A protein has these predicted regions:
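Conserved G1/Walker A P-loop phosphate-binding module
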Residues: 1-87, 91, 95-102
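C-terminal-of-GTPase-core extension/linker across diverse P-loop GTPases
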Residues: 3-4, 10-33, 39, 67, ...
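Generic enzyme active-site microenvironment
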Residues: 73, 106, 144
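Inter-motif core of Ras-like GTPase G domains
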Residues: 88-113, 129-136
């Protein structure tokens, strides 16, 4: 240009950005409950899977494709007691749960032979949700009793079913290893997501391959 002015002094700001994943469904539970294996079983994701806690240190995303639906599923790293106080990086993980519409609470049936301890897995995560953001308790839930192939005590299965009926939360038993219950879980996810659509004007999510 033939004419230019010096202009005004610019502004400088330092910003701290907080990342929160947006997903239709979030898989939550204690460490080593089998969430990553379930994600692999129901979606196109291929997360790292190991036989020890805290294998997943950041959320994994997968796309569950059913007919013309594309449902984004997030595998949230395991939550422990004190997560709401940032134990085990809990606050970092809980932030991602806030942006999900439906929560799937995965219980590890192989972790103990005690029904009370399995129920305690449910209570721990619920308590941390309540301490962090009570609105999380109002989300639609599906409870998954995972690793059913390793459960020998039928009384635990019956007792957990009775307990979840009292809680008025749908329960399904699955095995990511053998495939038991996986089709049923997918059906429950599709139905629940359909009943709780995204708010109008929200971001449209598409498969990375589209």
């Amino acid at each position: 240009p033939r004419f230019a002015e010096k202009g005004e002094e610019g502004q400088e700001k330092k910003l701290v950005l907080e990342l929160k994943l947006i997903a239709d469904v979030g898989l939550v539970g204690i460490p080593n409950a089998g969430k990553s294996s379930l994600l692999k079983a129901i979606s196109n994701a291929n997360p790292r899977i190991e036989g020890y806690p805290f294998t997943t240190l950041s959320p994994n995303l997968g796309i569950l494709a059913v007919d013309d639906q594309r449902i984004v599923v997030a595998d949230v790293p395991g939550l422990i007691e004190g997560a709401s106080e940032n134990k085990g990086l809990g606050i970092y993980f809980l932030r991602h749960v806030e942006r999900t519409r439906v929560l799937i609470h995965v219980l590890d049936l192989a972790a103990t032979n005690s029904l009370d301890q399995i129920i305690r897995q449910w209570e721990i995560v619920r308590e941390e949700f309540a301490a962090y953001n009570e609105n999380l308790l109002e989300r639609p839930y599906i409870v998954v009793g995972n690793k059913i192939d390793l459960l020998d005590d039928e009384a635990i299965r019956v007792g957990l079913s009775d307990y979840m009926k009292i809680q008025q939360v749908p329960l399904i038993f699955t095995s990511a290893l053998t495939g038991e219950g996986i089709d049923g879980l997918i059906g429950m996810i599709v139905d629940t997501v359909r009943d709780y659509p995204r708010p109008q004007g929200s971001t449209k999510l598409v498969s990375p391959t589209q």
